[in-house]
Regions:
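Short phosphate-coordinating micro-motif centered on Lys-Gly-acidic
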Residues: 3, 98-154
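Active-site acidic catalytic loop and adjacent metal/ATP-binding pocket
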Residues: 177-184, 191-192, 284, 344-396, ...
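An alpha-helical support segment within catalytic cores of ATP-dependent transferases
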Residues: 289-304, 309-310, 314-358, 371-373, ...
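ATP/Mg2+ or Mg2+-diphosphate-binding catalytic cores
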Residues: 451-505
Length: 505
């Protein structure tokens, strides 16, 4: 794939570099070819600065004499190499670029000095021209082809919107395949959500994929339908301002920057935000929820039930990923069957005749505090697309047993009591049955998340999630203290006695 970009100024070249930085991943190699003064260094510095969050005072020295400059504090670690002064392949080899590739993006000026390739994930940019005008010829390989094609689709979408002149800036998302960017124009900011339809994964059970069994959203339709309906009820989901449903792109209202997780990390007082979040959940539990809602364009979106098949396939992640992560082997058929049988009995107890909309990830990364609003609208809701019809206890678990940040047990108990008080005041409420469901679904969620974090590390190379495992283990053990979970506790004591030690870390 070859693309040509005509740059009329250094600023235009810098803009192209910043745009390409949105797609930066460790393991990529960007080769910068061209004569002296052709714009290679201008591009490289702008690329690095964009990965540093656009900090104008970020120090980016030239690698001309040092040969290599490393940047570990950028969003993705970068190594900037200048091979101009090297005279032999041996000197190039001694730099160890191949060893650096796994954990860095490599920006290499004068790549002609290389003998053979370093990576299949390469993008070659050839610079030519004189004066202010430059021609950048981009030749892409492997995933860079997909990125450049997607980038062109996004540019077309943004160009036709009210934010056509906005700079596209990286916005931190979650562990999913969705991407986010921030666009600002005339002092107004919006988020761009990039969510193309998910390709079918491998068949895992009963001729169905994992995402189909677990009822995970396959594309933008779920986001639009769920957000629109919740917004219409007065909840603070992000208003969708512009949409290309076919290409999986949306411009959405920005709900600010006071994310619950960030606020917690900063040591801010979370009493009001958390109580407000509890009020949202209590309000949702008191509503009658539809199984189908209108979707823009005249069609209908149907919600799935958070049934035993979905809950069970999530639980299986512990056997598939966490077990080999801890034990370095696979579970025996007997251990797996005992696990499944124990869970079958427990999940039968949380079936509910009148399910409520369950967002599933009602926790600190997806909640925003907006004190300038009133009532329930003070809590911003994002990441709603995997909403299903389930037990109201599930989202309470998500909030009070947050996998990403510590929620002290005493504070969680206080909030749990506040939730029960709100439900009791609103009408008949089975507090004992709810506590049982909370423990069962809490154990289910913790079991699932231990498997997910092990999978993220092993399959996706996202090892940072492992640091959350002790916290999740503590939640699991607390849920296992409920007398109705005695059988499940015995299974864990038999097969994972290390959990009790790991939870103390």
């Amino acid at each position: 794939m070859i693309i040509e970009f005509a740059s009329s100024s250094p600023a235009a070249t810098e803009g192209m570099a910043a745009e390409l930085s949105l797609w930066a991943r460790a393991g990529q190699c960007i080769l910068l070819s061209g004569e002296l003064g052709s714009g290679k260094s201008t591009f490289a510095r702008a690329f690095i600065r964009a990965l540093a969050g656009g900090q104008q005072d970020f120090d980016i020295p030239s690698p001309t004499f040092s040969l290599l400059q490393s940047y570990d504090s950028t969003r993705v670690p970068v190594v900037h190499a200048d091979l101009y002064r090297l005279r032999s392949a041996t000197e190039v080899e001694e730099l160890g670029l191949g060893d650096l590739l796994a954990s860095n993006v490599l920006l290499i000026e004068w790549p002609e000095k290389l003998e053979g390739g370093i990576s299949d994930e390469w993008l070659r940019i050839s610079f030519s021209g004189t004066g202010q005008n430059r021609l950048l010829k981009l030749q892409a390989q492997e995933s860079w082809v997909t990125y450049l094609e997607r980038n062109a689709v996004i540019n077309d979408f943004v160009t036709q919107s009210a934010f056509r002149n906005a700079a596209r800036i990286f916005f931190e998302g979650d562990a999913s395949a969705r991407r986010y960017e921030s666009l600002t124009a005339d002092s107004k900011s919006v988020l761009l959500m990039d969510m193309p339809n998910r390709p079918d994964g491998p068949i895992v059970k009963n001729n169905r994929t994992y995402s189909a069994i677990a009822h995970l959203a396959e594309g933008m339709s779920a986001v639009v339908a769920i957000n629109d309906y919740l917004f219409g009820l007065g909840y603070s989901t992000a208003e969708i301002l512009d949409l290309d449903l076919g290409n999986g792109l949306a411009l959405m209202e920005s709900l600010g920057h006071d994310v619950f997780g960030k606020m917690t990390a900063e040591g801010r007082d979370m009493r009001k935000p958390m109580r407000a979040a509890i009020e949202v959940l209590a309000d949702m539990a008191g509503r009658d929820w539809p199984r189908s809602v209108p979707l823009r364009g005249g069609s209908t979106y149907h919600l799935s039930e958070y049934d035993s098949d979905a809950l069970s396939i999530e639980i299986d992640l512990l056997l598939s990923w966490y077990w080999p992560h801890v034990k370095r082997d696979s579970p025996s058929a007997a251990a797996a069957e005992e696990f499944a049988a124990t869970w079958r009995g427990l999940l039968a107890r949380v079936e509910v005749e009148e399910p409520v909309w369950t967002l599933r990830d009602f926790h600190s990364p997806n909640l925003l505090w907006m004190p300038e609003r009133s009532g329930l609208r003070r809590v911003g809701l994002i990441d709603t697309q995997d909403c299903v019809l389930g037990h109201p206890a599930y989202d309470v678990v998500s909030l009070l047993q947050d996998a990403r940040v510590d929620v002290e047990f005493e504070f969680a108990d206080e909030l749990f009591g506040y939730y029960c008080d709100l439900r009791t005041a609103a009408g008949p409420f089975d507090a004992k049955g709810f506590a049982q469901a909370f423990a069962i679904l809490g154990a289910q969620r913790a079991t699932k998340i231990l498997g997910i974090f092990a999978r993220l590390s092993k399959r996706d190379g996202k090892h940072l999630y492992l640091k959350h495992m002790p916290r999740v283990s503590r939640y699991l053990l607390r849920n296992l203290q409920h007398p109705d979970l005695a059988g499940l506790r015995m299974w864990y004591e038999k097969h994972f006695p290390s959990l009790w030690d790991g939870a103390r870390k």
